[in-house]
Design a protein with these regions (language model features):
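Ribonuclease/tRNase effector modules and their secretory precursors
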Residues: 1-113
């Protein structure tokens, strides 16, 4: 649904969980890595979407809308295993090299920064 659409954080509302329990991680991602410009793969689940961005960040977004906006449940830096699973479940046989490079860079910035 969201794949290759520009990421617009103004269309997302932070969840209570994100605000109360994950705000440090959210801010670290925003300051050190960035959320990216587009989603490279989106996995649709029962009540949510798991979206991998072009910077290697996973955003978990509710399917429900509130006043035209979706709830950002949480966000975290992806792993190669998670990205592989997301791509495979979306019908892609192989993880693109630019995605694995982005994930490795994101994890290095997060840990080393």
């Amino acid at each position: 649904m969201f794949t290759n659409e520009p990421i617009n954080l103004r269309n997302l509302i932070p969840s209570e969980h994100l605000i109360e329990h994950r705000m440090d991680r959210y801010m670290e991602i925003q300051m050190k890595i960035g959320f990216g410009n587009k989603f490279v793969v989106v996995v649709e689940m029962d009540t949510k979407y798991e979206c991998l961005t072009d910077t290697g960040v996973v955003m978990v977004i509710s399917k429900d809308t509130y006043n035209g906006k979706r709830l950002l449940i949480t966000t975290y830096v992806g792993t190669i295993d998670k990205a592989n699973a997301m791509f495979r479940s979306s019908g892609y046989p192989k993880l693109p090299s630019f995605v694995s490079t982005a994930i490795l860079k994101a994890n290095k910035k997060r840990i080393g920064g």
